[in-house]
């Protein structure tokens, strides 16, 4: 739990707040750009890259020797999440016919909501029984599974743009 993390990494409250803030900033700030990257370079490719970066960030978090390294690794995770997030909705919109798209988006939304509720509960259990590092190690098998399933089931869709224009 948080006191264990603070004790093991000799971190104060401000540093531990940055563990979450670094992740959130790294997710939100590049979102518009990362969505466009999917349009230009391909949604499946950007999804897999994002999941991979997220996974590498999770491993870096789990082995972080200092709170500063943990904060940086959380930012890496956030960049990975930012790369994958816009691709999911884009792929759903492109591969499902109009009459099935609403159901597909609904299932996607429900899965995301259940994960948002179950994640902290499962994380609390893991951290309570195995230490704060378990909250990061648990991502690794899901990262591998997500990449394998995306490569097997998500089609390589044609890109819709040829360049990224800067404003």
Task: Briefly describe each language-model feature range.
Residues 1-152:
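Transmembrane-helix bundle of Major Facilitator Superfamily
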Residues 148-166:
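Helix-loop junctions on the cytosolic side of multi-pass membrane transporters
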